Structures are given as C-alpha cells and as structure tokens.
C-alpha cells in the first residue's frame, strides 16, 4: 500500500473488513523495527499487507531507502515479491490542491509504480483507492442507509478488460460516466425516502460532486 502521509492508508486497512487474527482490537498491525521504520505489517487470513511509509511516495531524499526496501522484498520473495499494489489517494487533497500540485502528485505516484515494476522485475495489478470520501458534501446522507451486504461491495471499476479496444484513459472516462449515472439513478429513490429538507438538499447534490 503506497500513498502520501495522512492519505488514510492505515484507516483503509483497518476498515477493510479483513480479519487480522494475530492482533488485538487496539493494534491490528505490527510495526517495523530498527532506527527507520519502512512499513507496518498487516497479517490477515487472506494476505499480508505492507503499509509503506508515506515519505517513500513523496520525499526524494528517501529514494535510496525506498530502493533498499524493494531490494529486500525481491531477495526474500524471489518468485513473487508482491501480488499487487494499492495506491491511496486522499479526496481531501483532490478537493484542495491546485492543478499544478495535482499533476506533480500524479507524476510522483506514477514514478513510484514504475520503480516497483523495474526494481522487482514483474508486472502486477494496481488498485487506486480514493480515501476520505466522507469529506465530500452529501456523502453521509447518500450512503447512511446502506445494508451490511451493500457496504461490503466495492464501488469502482476494473480497467483494461481483456479484448478492450480503447485506451485506459477512455475506459476510465466511460466507467466514471457509468458510476455517475448509477448515483443519479439511486438519488431518485433516496430522495423519495428522505423527509428532512436539509439532508435532502445534501443528498441531491452529492452525485454532482462526483
């Protein structure tokens, strides 16, 4: 799991719904040891997740330490150093940063992903997760009535489907449009059930924030 500091990486894992059998209720992960901590280790029934230090994503001064960390992974797990990467991107950053800052942010994340592929010598799936979406106006009102089964579903899209004849950018745009339409369809039903005028206004405006 990579992403800047305060992007919500640990909160994402803590609320993932995964079972972490080797941790107590207050501490679900194991911290790295030594003078400089590289990552936190999250041991679940299904996977081992590495929550990397946020500075690896944003700080050029830590580049050599980042490379040493990747070399360690490749040495200890020769066949498959990692099975995939989750990139945590905070919605708070998207809402407050200017276009130049966002472009730099995206470029740095892309560089880290390229370094992972080159240093580890393999291709892997990349999952982009937008965190802190509860900061978007209307989020709480829109999703407060979800059932447990609905909360367990992933709200997103998979790009690069087999046989796709469009670019990733075009696929993203198409999927984003589909997700927006689903929000609009849900809005009609939710508005009919909401009686509080203030909450109804927030609920109505949420899809347009998307």
Task: Give the location of each predicted region.
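Basic, amphipathic N-terminal segments
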Residues: 1-210
